[in-house]
């Protein structure tokens, strides 16, 4: 069964829309195989987003991701990765289709409510960053 990682970012957690976002996943055929609410440390955020370390937005991204708690989930199902990408919508909420998570809950390209794995290879790495195999059911 295909798996992908979702992070509900601090802006969406602060707005109290975690339940609505998790419901979107389940309503669209994705099983929540593991989930936890946590506060990322600076080291966690820097390690998780290390692929972006040379990009000009890296510092702001890390600061944002440690600004409040996040909800990290493993989503499972047929076509889980692309299904989650479609549910999230475009990275920039102004470009996201109506009815997507980002169109409905995100403020801007920085505070854009959710993160989702962009490939199956990255999904495996990202899932292992947050969860051991025994924590996923």
Curated annotation (Swiss-Prot):
Swiss-Prot/TrEMBL catalytic activity: a 2'-deoxyribonucleoside 5'-diphosphate + ATP = a 2'-deoxyribonucleoside 5'-triphosphate + ADP; a ribonucleoside 5'-diphosphate + ATP = a ribonucleoside 5'-triphosphate + ADP
Pfam families: NDK
Predominant location category: cytoplasm
Keywords: ATP-binding, Cytoplasm, Kinase, Magnesium, Metal-binding, Nucleotide metabolism, Nucleotide-binding, Phosphoprotein, Transferase
Cellular location(s): Cytoplasm
Cofactor(s) named in the record: Mg(2+)
Residue numbers annotated as active site: 115
Chain's role: Major role in the synthesis of nucleoside triphosphates other than ATP. The ATP gamma phosphate is transferred to the NDP beta phosphate via a ping-pong mechanism, using a phosphorylated active-site intermediate.
Protein name as it appears in the record: Nucleoside diphosphate kinase
Species, as recorded: Sulfurimonas denitrificans (strain ATCC 33889 / DSM 1251)
Gene responsible for this protein: ndk
């Amino acid at each position: 069964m295909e798996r992908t990682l979702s992070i509900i970012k601090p802006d969406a957690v602060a707005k109290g829309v975690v339940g609505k976002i998790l419901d979107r996943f389940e309503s669209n055929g994705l099983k929540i195989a593991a989930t936890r609410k946590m506060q990322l440390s600076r080291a966690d955020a820097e390690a998780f987003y290390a692929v972006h370390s040379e990009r000009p937005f890296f510092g702001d991204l890390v600061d944002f991701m440690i600004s409040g708690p996040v909800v990290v989930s493993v989503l499972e199902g047929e076509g889980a990765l692309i299904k989650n990408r479609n549910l999230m919508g475009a990275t920039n909420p102004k470009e996201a289709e109506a009815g997507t998570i980002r169109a409905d809950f995100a403020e801007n390209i920085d505070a854009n409510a959710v993160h989702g794995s962009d490939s199956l290879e990255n999904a495996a790495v990202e899932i292992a960053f947050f969860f051991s195999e025994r924590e996923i059911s």
